Amino acid sequence: MSLPTADAPALLSVRGLEVTFGENPEPVLHSVSFDIRPGERVAIVGQSGSGKSTIIGSILRLLPGDGHITGGSILLDGEDLSRASEQRMRSIRGRRIALVPQDPASNLNPSMRVGAQIADALAASGSRSKAEIDRRVLELMTEAGIPEAERRAKQYPHEFSGGMRQRVLIAIALSREPELLIADEPTSALDVTVQRQILNHLQTLVDAHGTSLLFITHDLGVAADRTDRIIVMSEGRIVEVGTPAEILLSPQEEYTKRLVAAAPTAVAAVRVASASSAVKPGPILEVSHLVKEFKIRGQRGSILKAVDDVSFSVERGTTTAIVGESGSGKTTVARIILGLESATSGTALVDGEGITSSRGRQRRALRRRVQPVFQDPYGSLDPTYSIEKLIDEPLRIFKVGDRRSRQERVAELLDQVALPRTVAQRRPNELSGGQRQRVAIARALALHPELLICDEAVSALDVLVQEQILTLLADLQTELGLSYLFITHDLAVVRQIAHNVVVMKRGRVMEQGATNTVFESPSSDYTRELLSAIPGASLVG
């Protein structure tokens, strides 16, 4: 690819941008300035609250609530968007500047077929016949990596996985061939191989059409692999700007150094916890020949084997990770172990007792020993409850102790997850994402479980917060002798925390073994493909 020349006129030029919300005179963006040239790929990297999304809202003139631009300019080919009318902005959004948003669930119409939603975006240009639109819909879906496009165009968003819904959003954004594509964490929820396909497609678009790309991400590896320049932000200010090699290999600012140090990579030194010496040897979990079949709605007699003859074990005091793409069956395995799904055949034993065959009192007892930590703490924590009520809810359900002893247990748990006891009377929306995940971990620990099932427990967190949560989990494992089954699509995280790894694809185990062995000498082509797709390894390896 030929990089844009340094003296090429900027397509987008942001100068001295300041944004405030409400009557608060303190800006949330402080004199932000940068350029994007035609065909250039620029990443903005930073934690939540750094101002990345506010920049997007400013460029598109879609700032939430009472946010408004109080200083600076945003020039698109010389036209100042900060002063453009709403009517003018409507002609620019989608046609000249398009957005791939982060959350497909809230950006697709649940009552409208997917193909029709892409067709709507195409029809907005007003220059195509229905036959041309129908043909282009299928082309866009195929380019975005959606198989069986003709059949799937007739389906609704809820019939797509999260990754597939994200591909639909990308197809919509690319439908009108914009000059500038703003991608807001477009692949953060996707598996590495799917991520690579999507990013390859975006790169092809840039090369073929000279489209500029503004990539918003917290993943330094993705930014390094896929962009020409990285802008590092913190607290509404630009901290550092440089090429990927400059930022990753020789960062100048302290904040950038912390970001680089916290970013997990496939080649990072393994930092798994050592279990307490008091932990007795042997497996806490044994899964043998597990099978789960689902009937496919609308296809008489058709069966989907979501889990197909899966066997593995988790030793006490260790971490086993299950990795795989969307649809690999890893979450279904976790749901069976948690007793949330029944198995078609096979067994899952916790300390020799059958989860799949247990009923009534025995199942309740097993559930005390196995607890989940989910991906989205905001979605899994009742927003009307105080933190104290959320953490002591399992104790109340299982009738453990009196009110005073439960309060003492909540205080002890807050100490264990490094939260101040003062948060007990606050509510989830008053906490950061990392703090909410600590509350979810405290809640999971309330009943003294032996095994935690962590389902994408850190995938929604920024790298600095992610590192803190992974360190906390490792410390708790050492202190309490906990065992973890870690469900994830992030192999770089697996390298950091897991003693053993199980690689799944389409319901089957492709490979399993010690993490070091699987990463350094993979025996499966699929594992090698997953490892080669991890972003950033070429620069930090």
PLM-predicted stretches and their roles:
Residues 60, 64, 338:
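Helix-to-loop junction immediately C-terminal to a conserved catalytic motif
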Residues 68-80, 346-354, 366:
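Conserved ABC transporter NBD signature motif
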Residues 80, 132-151, 405-422, 531-532:
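Conserved ABC ATPase "signature" region
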Residues 155-160, 164, 427-431, 435:
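Conserved ABC ATPase signature
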Residues 168, 173-174, 445:
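ABC ATPase C-loop
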Residues 177, 448:
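Conserved catalytic motifs of ABC-family nucleotide-binding domains
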Residues 241-242, 250, 512-513, 521:
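ABC ATPase "signature
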